[in-house]
Amino acid sequence: MRITQGTFSFLPDLTAAQVKAQIQYALDQNWAVSVEYTDDPHPRNTYWEMWGLPMFDLRDAAGVYGEVEACRTAHPGKYVRVNAFDSNRGWETVRLSFIVQRPEKEDGFRLDRTEGPGRTQRYALQHRSYAAG
């Protein structure tokens, strides 16, 4: 099952040219770009591992893309994403985030609902391997 997180998550994977174009767009907006990776894409896992430091002073998409490729090479079976942070007063948040690499086999999640005392509903997310069936 394909994990859907971030911008473009319902589209096919971006090509190298499309990734570079999105990075250039972020740089043109004066957003700081960073690269992160993880093996746990659970929705509550918002803190992925950073690849190096955010590139505050870099203005060239090719330089950022080089870091994306280095992260992909170092972590071939993990998720890799690009974030663009807007530090302008009033925003100060991630304005663009998209996954640029996925493992060959993506695990998914299942929502379990159980009824408790007084008809209360309890929900739990379960990690699930879809390759097992």
From Swiss-Prot:
One of its GO terms (molecular function) is ribulose-bisphosphate carboxylase activity. RuBisCO catalyzes two reactions: the carboxylation of D-ribulose 1,5-bisphosphate, the primary event in carbon dioxide fixation, as well as the oxidative fragmentation of the pentose substrate. Both reactions occur simultaneously and in competition at the same active site. Although the small subunit is not catalytic it is essential for maximal activity. Keywords: Calvin cycle, Carbon dioxide fixation. Heterohexadecamer of 8 large and 8 small subunits. This is Ribulose bisphosphate carboxylase small subunit. The keyword DNA repair does not apply. One of its GO terms (biological process) is reductive pentose-phosphate cycle. Belongs to the RuBisCO small chain family. The basic functional RuBisCO is composed of a large chain homodimer in a 'head-to-tail' conformation. In form I RuBisCO this homodimer is arranged in a barrel-like tetramer with the small subunits forming a tetrameric 'cap' on each end of the 'barrel'. InterPro entries: RuBisCO_ssu, RuBisCO_ssu_dom, RuBisCO_ssu_sf.
